[in-house]
Amino acid sequence: MRSTAYLTALLSFLGATHAAPEGPRCRCTPDQSCWPSPGLWQTLNKTLSGNLVAVKPVGTVCHDPTYNGGLCDSVKGMQTDSSWRSAQPGAVQSINWETWPEKNESCYIDGPRQVPCGQGRIPLYSAVVQSPLDIQKTVRFASKYNLRLVIKNTGHDFLGRSTGPQSLQILTHNMKSINFTDNFVPEGKPDGRGIGQAVTIGAGVQLNELYEAAGKRGLTQVIGLSTTVGAAGGYIQGGGHSPLGPWKGMSTDHVLEYKVVTAGAKFVTANEYQNSDLFWALRGGGGGTFGVVTSVTLRTFKDPPTIVSQVNVTMDGKANESYWAAVEKFQAYLPTLSDGGCSGYYYMLPNVTLGPQSAAVIIAAFYYANKTDKAHVDNLYRPLFASLSSIPGINVASVSVPVSSSTEAFRSAFDQKPPRDGGGVNILGSRLFSRKLLEAPGGAANLTAALSKLDFKNLQPAIGHLVAGGQVAKNTHIQSALNPSWRKALVHLVISRDWSIDSTFAEQEKISTKLTAEEIPLLAAVEPDMGAYTNEADVNEPRFQQTFWGTNYNTLLRVKNRWDPRGLFFVRSGVGSEAWDKQGLCRA
C-alpha cells in the first residue's frame, strides 16, 4: 500500500541514534579572525553575479551621521508599505524584529535623528539570489566560514525568524516563477502517471501574485488571505491556514513536491517518492529549519463561487457583561456556522474609543466557498442573531454578497495599494481550540471567561480564525509534520501586543513577559492539550516543542539532525533550536 511504503521510507533511518555531531560552539562573528576577509566577500559577490549586498537597516538614512533628507522622506513614506518592506534586505514587516534590545541596537525610521543607528538583528550581508545555484554557493560559503545564516522571503514572520544578528542573509524574494500544469508528475513516481492540476511556484512568489495568476485561469489553491506573505516560505512550511481550509484542508496538505537546497549545499527533490522524510518535515515542521526551499508544487482547483459576508455585533460603551455574553453566544455557535460552510475571521474588540465615543464590537469577515445561495447564509444566521439580539444593549447587522469566485472574494479583501500593514511592533500569543470544546456545556463560556481577563488597549483585538474543521479535520490520512491538534481544532485564536518605539528594553520585556507568563496561560488552561500554530504564536513559548508540534516533535528532530547535522539552519523556537542561544550564535 502507498501509505505503508511512505511510512516505511520515513522511518527507515530511525533505528539508530541520531544525535547531531558537535561543530564549533559558536558561529564566527565580525570581531573574530575567522570572519571572512573583504576579499573573500568580494569573491562571493562575483560568484553571485554582483548580487551580494552589504546591508544597513532601512532607517539609516534618517539618522546622523548618515542622514539624507530626501531619502529619509522617501523611506518614511514607504515604511508601512509591506510590499516595499518585503523586497528590502534591511527590513522585515514587524520592526521589533529589526532591533536587538539586549545590545541596545535599533534603527527606527521615526526615531530621533541624533540617535545613531545600530545594526540590530539586521543581517550584515544579503545574497539576493536568483536561482538554486546562487543558494548553493551561499550555503557553501556560510558553512565553510561557520556563519549565522538567515533566510528571508518576505519578512512576515511574527517570531523573528527572518532576521538574525551578525548574519548572512539569503533573500529569495526575486525567485518569482509561476508555472501551471494540467497533470503534474512528481519526480521519481514509479508509474510516471500524472496526479492532476498543479502550480509550481518559485520561493519568492507572494500570495497576491499567485491569486492573480491562478484567477486568470479560473483556478485557485489553498493559500492564506494576505497580499504580501510569501506562498512558498515559512507560511506553507509551517502548515498554512486558509479561508479555503474547511473546504479543502491546510495549505501544506496540498503540497506535491519541494525543491530544496540542503545544509550540504545539495539541490534535491522532496516528495512522496524520494527524500520522503524531508518532504514530511517540510509539510508543517516550519520554515528556515531543514533547508532552503527554492520552489513548491501545489494542487490547484477550479475556482469556486463564494459568498462574502460581514457580521457586526456592537454595543455602546466599553465591554461589560452584555458584551461578553455576546462573545460567548457567538463562539458557541461557531460549530453550526462551520457545518454550514462558513470560514473566515472574527475580531473581538472590547475597547474601541474614538474621541468621546466608545464601543465594544465583534466584527466578522466570513466566506462560504462553493456556495451561491444567499438565503442559505441568512437562514444560518437567523438563530444566532435572534440569540444575540436578546442581550440588552447588543445590536446586530450583516450583509452577504455572492461573488463569482473565491479569488474575487479574497482579493477584494486586500485591495489596498500599496498594502499598508507593515512597519509596526507586533508580538503574538495564540492557542488552538477544538470543536469538542465549543460544543461542550460550558466550553464557550470558559473560553470567553479567559478572554475577558486579558488586557485590551484601545482598538486591540483578539482574532478568531475559523479556518479549521471541515476538510482540515478529515485529512487525518495525510502524513505530515503538522501539529496533530489542527485535525481536532475549529478555531485558531490570536492576541497581539505592542509597544512604542521609545520604550526601554525593560518596558518591552515587561510586556513580553506578561504575555508569556500570564496572558497565554489563561488561554492555554481552557484546553491544555491543544497547543498552538507555529507560525503565529509566542516566540518565548516555554514548551514550544510540544505546543507547536505535539507528538511529531521527536521525529522532526531526527529529520533535522539527519539533514542538518551541524545546525547550519536556525530559527527561534524552531525544531532543534533548543541546542542554541536565542540568537543562534552559540550553542546552549
UniProtKB/Swiss-Prot annotation:
Record's keyword terms, sorted: FAD, Flavoprotein, Glycoprotein, Oxidoreductase, Secreted, Signal
Signal peptide residue numbers: 1-19
Localization (cell): Secreted
UniProt main location, coarse: secreted
GO cellular component: extracellular region
Residues with attached carbohydrate: N45, N104, N179, N312, N320, N351, N370, N446
Span of domain FAD-binding PCMH-type: 118-303
Modified residues (Pros-8alpha-FAD histidine): H156
Enzyme Commission identifier(s): 1.-.-.-
Protein name in UniProt: Uncharacterized FAD-linked oxidoreductase ARB_02478
Natural source organism: Arthroderma benhamiae (strain ATCC MYA-4681 / CBS 112371)
